[in-house]
UniProtKB/Swiss-Prot annotation:
This is tRNA (guanine-N(1)-)-methyltransferase. Homodimer. Belongs to the RNA methyltransferase TrmD family. PANTHER family: TRNA (GUANINE-N(1)-)-METHYLTRANSFERASE (PTHR46417:SF1). Pfam families: tRNA_m1G_MT. Its EC number is 2.1.1.228. GO terms for cellular component: cytosol. It comes from the Bacteria.
């Protein structure tokens, strides 16, 4: 683990990876980076190579039954997980970033933000030995229906989307309440100065100063955009309303 001092009661992300130097990466910039510096959350990395076996610290081996690629070994992963999870509470999920997992969504991020922290396992090669997932009851989570070379980018996406929900990170709680997915709908269009650009004016209602009409317009826009672009979300939203 990286020797970062522990801050009691602060949300933590612990990452098991072959590339600890990839962190914090973009998480060290902008609002998440400032929040990290201010101690609003913490980041720890575990270098999986440290737990490798043999003179060359091997972390993988060939797939049982044959096939292309390499699979991360269960003995290596088990040792890394045990070390990384030391001192964690019962409210601390262990997640493996995997294309076969549950898709990331806002509800997941809101749930993780209410936890004490999260440990993320970043895979490489052909993935991890299935016995590790079974033994530790690891939850699989996916960034989308595509395959990447490793889980590090997906881990950064998950952390970014969760950290911004932590108290004090954004500064304006309304920002998280009004954005896409928070109400089950996609976000309404946004505009700013100048009032007209390339012959395109800002919609009059947004310049009216009438907060009620602005809210109605934004709601209608959110519903229409969701209905057209994400019929799956729209159906879910309609079903929730009917309940």
């Amino acid at each position: 683990m990286t020797p970062t001092p522990e801050l009691h009661g602060v949300w933590q992300a612990r990452i098991i990876t072959l590339f600890p130097q990839a962190f914090p990466g973009v998480l060290g910039e902008s609002l998440t980076g400032k929040a990290l510096q201010d101690g609003l959350w913490q980041l720890h990395t575990t270098d999986l190579r440290r737990f490798g076996v043999g003179k060359h610290r091997n972390v993988d081996d060939t797939p049982a039954g044959g096939g292309a690629g390499m699979v991360l070994r269960p003995d290596v992963l088990g040792a890394a997980i045990e070390a990384t999870m030391q001192g964690t509470s019962s409210n601390w999920p262990l997640i493996y970033l995997s294309p076969r997992g549950r898709p990331m969504d806002q509800a997941l991020m809101q749930s993780l933000a209410r936890c004490d922290g999260v440990t993320l396992l970043c895979g490489r090669f052909e993935g991890v030995d299935e016995r590790v997932l079974e033994h530790y009851g690891i939850q699989e989570v996916s960034l989308g229906d595509f395959v990447m070379t490793g889980g590090e980018i997906a881990a950064q996406a998950l952390i970014d989307a969760t950290v911004r929900l932590l108290p004090g990170v954004l500064g304006n709680q309304a920002s998280t309440e009004e954005e896409s997915f928070s109400s089950g709908l996609l976000e309404h269009p946004q505009y700013t100065r100048p009032a007209e650009w390339m012959g395109r004016p800002i919609p009059e209602v947004l310049m009216s100063g009438h907060h009620g009409k602005v809210a109605e317009w934004r709601r209608a826009q959110s519903e229409e955009i969701t209905r057209r672009r994400r019929p799956d979300l729209w159906q879910r939203h309609q079903a929730t309303k009917d309940d």
